Amino acid sequence: GKIEQIDTPINIYNKPKSAFVADFIGTTSIITKNDALSYFNYSSSFSIRPEFVMINQSKNSDFNLTANISDIQFQGSLYKLLLEKDSILINAYYYPNSSNSINLEIGESINLSWDKINITDLNE
């Protein structure tokens, strides 16, 4: 085995040095360099944590994607969603309340967005 990163748990979670480390603690979505270029005109692979993926928000974010819901897990105060767009898999959390209620169904298409400040470049 090889040690990928030595750091505090908080730094490993917030600033992983590789896709392996990003996926080791918590949930994340890894966007490959090819997909980053094709869909976002971005030149590096990156990870995005589900808590930073906004659902059906304004398209004024740095990254926007329309994807289909492929899995829904009710977890009490939130829904954990898995979304697909071609080869891209995105994990997102949806926190329902009376002002943002949307219909969640497998196969439904929804708009996703996130800001550059919330991604981690993986340089892989």
Specify the residue positions occupied by each region the protein language model found.
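Short, flexible active-site loop motifs that bind/organize anionic cofactors or intermediates
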Residues: 2, 11, 43
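ABC ATPase "signature
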Residues: 3-8, 15
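Residues located in well-ordered beta-strands
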Residues: 8, 20, 34, 66-70
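Short, solvent-exposed coil/turn linker segments
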Residues: 8-11, 32, 49, 115
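Non-catalytic connector elements of ABC transporters
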Residues: 28, 37-124
